[in-house]
């Protein structure tokens, strides 16, 4: 990650500030020196005339801000560049993006998102380069569409600078370095079997079911999943009267593999969300009580409280 000028792919720090962003960010000093940051900027949310109840502050990035805790620097500014004024709001809004980050759709996803959700402490706001936004969008939106999401208006790339100092990861012409080492597996089926990751998927989903599957067939470019037995863990938008005739869809999944569906003799943990009239599968795991991580998930699920703010995607 670095601060660069987007024109001609040049990178550099044209800022007379001191801040350490680690080896990946151009060296500019220690963030711990800043307890208060006063932004004098003519771009972004500070131009909007919005009244903030508190002046901008430089604060520690908390461990439970999972999206940005390991981004490479330790302090961030509040309000952030998405106009979130409190850490509670930042954590709740950022949690929507953690499952996407885990999909590794682009090498610059975390750098791009954290430059907005958890901007580094400088004497004025520095936005991500437009080309970085476009590269992340072009790589990640196809993955998002498997989950029924599109690139949100709040991250529209033409809002970000082209010819000014901006947050960069690699030069714009180094596209080969930013391409993900991806897989052909349907993204909702490509899940890490870690209790924390399952909890994150649960919170990002609207409903969760323990399910036995009757059959899977292709329909209009999707995989259509017909349940045999189901027990709700989290109903969300599903009405009890509709459970009997519930059908799920793996969006755009007709031709990508989902290895969990190769053997339907198991019970599954199915998570999803409703998009228009369809119930979309957003994550699937074999229901395996013998697995240590799955057992941990079951314990955590009983007491875990998911974020309550409305999703940034809606």
Swiss-Prot record:
Residues 186-306 form the NTR domain. Residues 1-31 form the signal peptide. Glycans are attached at residue 173. PROSITE patterns: FZ (PS50038), NTR (PS50189). Disulfide bonds join 58-121, 68-114, 105-140, 129-166, 133-157, 186-256, 189-258, 203-306. GO terms for cellular component: cell surface; collagen-containing extracellular matrix; cytosol; extracellular exosome; extracellular region; extracellular space; plasma membrane. Its main location: secreted. Keywords: Developmental protein, Differentiation, Disulfide bond, Glycoprotein, Secreted, Signal, Wnt signaling pathway. Residues 53-169 form the FZ domain. The keyword Cell division does not apply. Interacts with WNT1, WNT2 and FRZD6. Interacts with WNT4, WNT8 and MYOC. May have therapeutic use in cardiac surgery. This is Secreted frizzled-related protein 1.
